[in-house]
Amino acid sequence: MEEFQFIKYKGFDHVFKYSGPWLWWLVGFYLCLPILAYTLLPYLTMNGTISGKRKTVSIFVLGDLGHSPRMCYHAKSFSKLDYYVNLCGYLEEQPPFDIIDDINIDIYPITVTKNTSNLPFILFAAKKMVVQFFQLLKLLSDFRGTDYVLIQNPPSIPILLIVLAYIKVFSRKTKLIIDWHNLNYTILNLKFQNLKHPLVRILKTYERVLGQFADYNITVTRQMKEFLIKEFNFNKKKIITLHDRPGEQFKPLESLGVTKQEILESHDIFRDIQNISKYKILVSSTSFTPDEDFNLLLSALNQYDNSLAERGLPPILIIITGKGPLKSQFLQKVKQLNFSDNVIIKNAWLSSEDYPLILSVADLSISLHTSSSGIDLPMKIVDFFGCGIPVITLRFPAIGELVTHGTNGLITKSDKDSSVNESQEIYRLLTEAFKNDELLDKIKQGALKESNLRWEENWNNKMGKRFEYSTD
């Protein structure tokens, strides 16, 4: 064993003794790598980043741009402040012409992922998230250096996490704006009806934790602002309440320069109805999803049909615009009820140009929105008011921020947690409005007054000073 005596363990002391200070520099550099990568990586590949004196906002909508009016209104408002606007979303329907023609707005399509292979829900959801991840990553990379990224919530998965992570790592000067239309976890709860369900609680935590990293949070109601402060512990200084207001395309009939009769005679939806001038016209808009129970309306209309002759009520035409997963079920129920010619129900998918025109000739509108959270408001009522049309609406916590009973509309006494029959309430308010001309005229005047409150003025008052800038 004597020949192996020269092999002795000496530890690492000799390494430090003979290596010199360069080793310490190497160790220090190694330990600093995460920090260096986080701070310098965004600047190592600057090709393609947005730069210049004019500011840029990138708006992401995981929905159809043609039917996302609030986000399109944001785009127009930023454009008027001389921002470059990158507007990203689905292009299932053509966006409004004023968006297409705006020289400051560029539209970038996001491909709709459809379940053409009839995959189970979980597998399809996973596939959709992966596809959206790469699409969003590509767009974010193209817009790296944008001054602001504006997203809507819901949906929050996967877009909130992807956008936030990208900004924090690759585009750290970019500020994140979240426009809270509703709470995503409450929509998921429509499926489970249990706020303590693990998936619902996970999604609530996801929204609460990630939402706090936003630089600005915009809410559609004051109640939603209070919720974010009290329940999600958001900084109230970062929250702006921006109520929906109608765009310029929604105008009362008196402002259109055309008569009601001319519209009734020219549009296909009215042409096959005998004596259309005798009918009261109702309108409603829906996406045919579970949060709007159209069985309530059908039941009320059935009661109206059965009592029309006895109570001297006028015949009605109700136009329901929109499409969605429960549309075929709704149309089948209409067929089964076999309404008389005194109650005509039509479903139409209208263009963004035709929709305001049809609203303008209505006598009354109906909203069945109850809100999964109770603290959002339906854009459809804002559109109705823009055309000067009063509304019958179901009661829920935030509805008073938009509709005042007996002034610009009528609100049911019941809500979804009440023992009062909601369909009976809708029927009662319908007959009350059409039997009492004085009441109908009063709420009509109130709706016309609401039509004077416009998006542009409201946006400039609440948002303009925060986002205006000078190119000098």
From Swiss-Prot:
Q: Which residues lie on this side of the membrane: Cytoplasmic?
A: 42-118, 140-472
Q: In which pathway does it act?
A: Protein modification; protein glycosylation
Which residue windows are coiled coil?
none
One Gene Ontology term, aspect cellular component: cytoplasmic side of endoplasmic reticulum membrane
Alphabetically ordered keywords of this record: Endoplasmic reticulum, Glycosyltransferase, Membrane, Transferase, Transmembrane, Transmembrane helix
Q: Where in the cell is it found?
A: Endoplasmic reticulum membrane
EC nos: 2.4.1.142
Task: Output the InterPro entries linked to this UniProt entry.
Answer: ALG1-like, Glyco_trans_1
Intramembrane segments per UniProt: 119-139
Q: Name one GO biological process term.
A: dolichol-linked oligosaccharide biosynthetic process
Q: Which domain of life, per UniProt?
A: Eukaryota
What molecular functions are annotated in GO for this chain? chitobiosyldiphosphodolichol beta-mannosyltransferase activity
EC main class here is transferase
How does the protein associate with the membrane? Single-pass membrane protein
Known catalytic reactions: an N,N'-diacetylchitobiosyl-diphospho-di-trans,poly-cis-dolichol + GDP-alpha-D-mannose = a beta-D-Man-(1->4)-beta-D-GlcNAc-(1->4)-alpha-D-GlcNAc-diphospho-di-trans,poly-cis-dolichol + GDP + H(+)
For the Lumenal compartment, the record's topological domain ranges are 1-20
- Write the signal peptide boundaries: none
Predominant cellular place of this UniProt entry's protein: endoplasmic reticulum
Segments spanning the bilayer are 21-41
> What does this gene product do?
Participates in the formation of the lipid-linked precursor oligosaccharide for N-glycosylation. Involved in assembling the dolichol-pyrophosphate-GlcNAc(2)-Man(5) intermediate on the cytoplasmic surface of the ER.
Family as reported in the entry's similarity comment:
Belongs to the glycosyltransferase group 1 family.
By its UniProt entry, which PANTHER family does this protein fall under? BETA1,4 MANNOSYLTRANSFERASE, CHITOBIOSYLDIPHOSPHODOLICHOL BETA-MANNOSYLTRANSFERASE
Q: Per its record, how is this protein called by name?
A: Chitobiosyldiphosphodolichol beta-mannosyltransferase
**Species name for this entry?**
Debaryomyces hansenii (strain ATCC 36239 / CBS 767 / BCRC 21394 / JCM 1990 / NBRC 0083 / IGC 2968)
